[in-house]
Amino acid sequence: MIVPKISERFEHCRARQRCALIPFLTAGDPDLETTVAALKILDDHGADLIELGMPYSDPLADGPVIQAAATRALQRGTRLEAVLEMTTDLHQQLTAPLILFSYYNPIYHRGVSSFLKAVAQAGIKGLVIPDLPLEEAEPVLAETANLGLELTLLIAPTTSPERMRAIATASQGFIYLVSTTGVTGMRQEMASRVQELLHTLRQITPKPIGVGFGIASPEHARQVRDWGADAAIVGSAFVKRLAEPDQGLAAVAEFCQSLRTALDTP
């Protein structure tokens, strides 16, 4: 199976007027075998792309749910080599392109070129590096383009319009719009400022826009769709469900299907 690039998957969704669903999981929580099973379930229940978080000891952008998942995964010995070995074996069984979510420190220590080549060879199609500022992204962007990877950059509610334009121009695959200041995690309601930010970005760029941080329910997903998002990115709500010892995989399947149904309902 030939897995499409991230930008190609968004073109496919746009042609069908489909808001993409992008679930997030932490690799290795509770273990890599469960991660494999969960990725297959997400792929079977309506995920268009899937973010796979590389566990890190100091995840500054992540809230308590994903921080705890990263700690558990690291305690079980989850390392990059094992995660890439897993995706090498798995990616051709999935229709959803995989996006690796990784902080910059592990990339820097391995060496940018070495890291990116290993990721590309493992069948991963894109990267999100939440602590990589635009000013330092150019070397990574140049290498990802040569390897067939796409590096997606983040825009926050506090980003100025001028900086939004620069980030939107540089970002590959899609633009990751952070819905709120602060860390990842489930919110009671979506900030109405997201609608304004989406409108502003639409005037700047034709690139797809995914909204993440805080989407915790089918209603939230439908709301960002109605506000004009091209994708709903859902992390903590999936990670929390997968952490349930007895019903984790079943809960992930049910929740993914509920999000897909909400996004497909006019």
Curated annotation (Swiss-Prot):
EC number, UniProt record: 4.2.1.20
PROSITE patterns, per the entry: TRP_SYNTHASE_ALPHA (PS00167)
Entries under InterPro entries matching the protein: Aldolase_TIM (IPR013785), RibuloseP-bd_barrel (IPR011060), Trp_synthase_alpha_AS (IPR018204), Trp_synthase_suA (IPR002028)
One GO CC term on file: cytosol
Active site positions: E51, D62
Gene Ontology MF terms: tryptophan synthase activity
Quaternary organization: Tetramer of two alpha and two beta chains.
Name of the protein in question: Tryptophan synthase alpha chain
Higher taxonomy: Bacteria, Bacillati, Cyanobacteriota, Cyanophyceae, Acaryochloridales
